[in-house]
Curated annotation (Swiss-Prot):
GO terms for biological process: bacterial-type flagellum assembly. It comes from Salmonella typhimurium (strain LT2 / SGSC1412 / ATCC 700720). Signal peptide: none annotated. NCBIfam families: flgK_ends. Pfam families: Flg_bb_rod, Flg_bbr_C, flgK_1st_1, FlgK_D1. InterPro entries: Flag_bb_rod_N, Flagellar_basal_body_rod_CS, Flg_bb/hook_C_dom, FlgK, FlgK_D2-like, FlgK_helical. It is found in: Secreted; Bacterial flagellum. This is Flagellar hook-associated protein 1.
């Protein structure tokens, strides 16, 4: 009789455990990162009796997470790529929207400026036309500055976003390390049974971390996660979390980059080319490949325009017969010394000598002990710099003066057009200073009137001259910039959408294994309810039989 009661009680306990698990699944249906659980029932060991081995009911051997590591890793990899592409696309679309806005187009301002110049060429002696040209010039400069400032602000926002990403990475790493410790201790207390809720929390944190920076997960004995970034740097080792830091770049102090915090060596800068995954990788890639290229192309255009216009303007004569002066001011090249250089006092200075040869790129300049190796950051082309008779380096329309004392492996970052627009202004403020004439009326041998417009015509002809990079007109250069940005944005949008669809498909696969299906849980609820009632009926039968025995007299 006791065996029958024990069997019924084991069944009731098993049914109760299974119902609790089903209930827990339903409760957590909308919880992000929850993994469906299943109660595992097993047959209890039988007992040898008079008639042979007799069963002893059922017992709960554990509660299993329905987890597929292979699909989960595939999903993480896809999410990592998707996050990087989406971040890069979102940033790039901001530039695309800026350049595509016809109401504030630089192309329109250029056209207005040359249209005003055409009017002045037709009426060289007209003070109103002269004043109108100055107004259009100021409007053009303002448009250059507005566009450039937007890109500078975006650069600052990238710096802020990098700092925010690093803070999130550190926070996630600490939480994962803490969960590693808790899971290890609770698994020991539970005689090997894992705390499923903590496993879910840890996996969810790993997924969120992976969206920011790609991580590789290796599992130690006992289920502890060790995390390394895709570049090989350890982020979590058991219950210890390594830290990252957002620091000024050693190459460019205006830029924030990522460093690995080492207790002995301090902050060790991580090469940005190794951080190319997740939203952080998307930010860094956008900055180095997209934002820099756009800013440099815009700066190259401004430099070529201002320098060409100045060169021609100084060849002419103004309304008072004086030699023409520079019409525009323009910013000079910037050179940053790497903070890791052996001699911090060594510096380089650069000057534009031929604006038509200046390229839309920055340059990394490294001393190899004998020569100076130059790398164009736009295409990673490396060459040995040539020197002029004075020992100055000649680089794409620039001359670079090198200070004494440079040591092997000292490096510098040359930014030819970084500040071109910042310091761009209209220098001619008096309409009489516009040099429209090709000869001075002060010269007694020259018989020219106020209508002399030959230098003005030469200025107007610059509109169709290939002065940007030596192969493009002003309008062509800007149109190419707008087109390149638009094409790149479109490509990123397509890639981002495609990768997002891959994530959706893998997520569906993952959820088919680990997700909670309410219809399935409702079915399990009914099944275990019947199972419970059946065992209750067995117990009721055993009680009835026991009562019958007690009533025998």
């Amino acid at each position: 009789m006791s065996s029958l009661i024990n069997h019924a009680m084991s069944g009731l306990n098993a049914a109760q455990a299974a119902l609790n698990t089903v209930s827990n699944n339903i409760n957590n249906y909308n919880v992000a990162g929850y993994t469906r659980q299943t109660t595992i029932l097993a047959q209890a060991n039988s007992t040898l009796g008079a008639g042979g081995w007799i069963g002893n009911g059922v017992y709960v051997s554990g509660v299993q997470r329905e987890y597929d590591a292979f699909i989960t890793n595939q999903l993480r990899g896809a999410q990592n790529q998707s996050s990087g592409l989406t971040t890069r696309y979102e940033q790039m679309s901001k530039i695309d929207n800026l350049l595509a806005d016809k109401s504030s187009s630089l192309s329109g301002s250029l056209q207005s400026f040359f249209t005003s110049l055409q009017t002045l060429v037709s009426n060289a002696e007209d003070p109103a036309a002269r004043q109108a040209l100055i107004g259009k010039a100021e409007g053009l400069v303002n448009q250059f500055k507005t566009t450039d400032q937007y890109l500078r602000d975006q650069d600052k926002q990238v710096n802020i976003a990098i700092g925010s990403s690093v803070a999130q990475i550190n926070n996630y790493a600490k939480q994962i390390a803490n969960l590693n410790d808790q899971i290890s201790r609770m698994t020991g207390v539970g005689a090997g049974a894992s705390p499923n809720d903590l496993l879910d929390q840890r996996d969810q944190l790993v997924s969120e971390l992976n969206k920011i920076v790609g991580v590789e997960v290796s599992v130690q004995d006992g289920g502890t996660y060790n995390l390394t970034m895709a570049n090989g740097y350890t982020l979590v080792q058991g219950s210890t979390a390594r830290q990252l830091a957002a620091v000024p770049s050693s190459a460019d102090p205006t830029r924030t980059t990522v460093a690995y915090v080492d207790e002995a060596a301090g902050n060790i800068e991580i090469p940005e080319k190794l951080l190319n995954t997740g939203s952080l990788g998307g930010l860094l890639t956008f900055r180095s490949q997209d934002l820099d290229q756009t800013r440099n192309t815009l700066g190259q255009l401004a430099l070529a325009f201002a320098d060409a216009f100045n060169a021609q303007h100084t060849k002419g004569y103004d309304a008072d017969g004086n030699k023409g002066k520079d019409f525009f001011s323009i910013g000079s090249p910037v050179v940053y010394s790497n903070s890791n250089n052996a001699d911090k006092t060594v510096s380089l200075t650069a000057k534009v000598v031929d604006s038509t040869k200046v390229q839309a790129t920055d340059y990394k300049i490294v001393f190899d002990g004998t020569d100076w190796q130059v790398t164009r950051t736009a295409d990673n082309t490396t060459f040995t710099a040539t020197k002029d008779a004075d020992g100055k380096l000649e680089i794409d329309g620039l001359k670079v003066t090198v200070g004494t004392g440079a040591q092997k492996n000292d490096s510098f970052l040359l930014k030819p057009v970084s500040n071109a627009i910042v310091d761009m202004n209209v220098k001619v403020t008096n309409e009489a200073e516009i040099a429209m004439a090709s000869e001075s009326k002060l010269d007694p041998d020259v018989d020219t009137g106020d209508s002399d417009n030959r230098n003005g015509q030469a200025l107007l002809d610059l509109q169709n001259s290939n002065v940007v990079g030596g192969n493009k007109t002003f309008n062509d250069a800007y149109a190419t910039l707008v087109s390149d940005v638009g094409n790149k944005t479109s490509t990123l949008k397509t890639s981002s959408t495609t990768q997002a669809n891959v994530v959706k498909q893998l997520y569906k696969q993952q959820q088919s294994v680990s997700g909670v299906n309410l219809d399935e849980e409702y079915g399990n609820l009914q099944r275990y309810q019947q199972y419970y009632l059946a065992n209750a009926q067995v117990l009721q039968t055993a009680n009835a039989l026991f009562d019958a025995l007690l009533n025998i007299r």
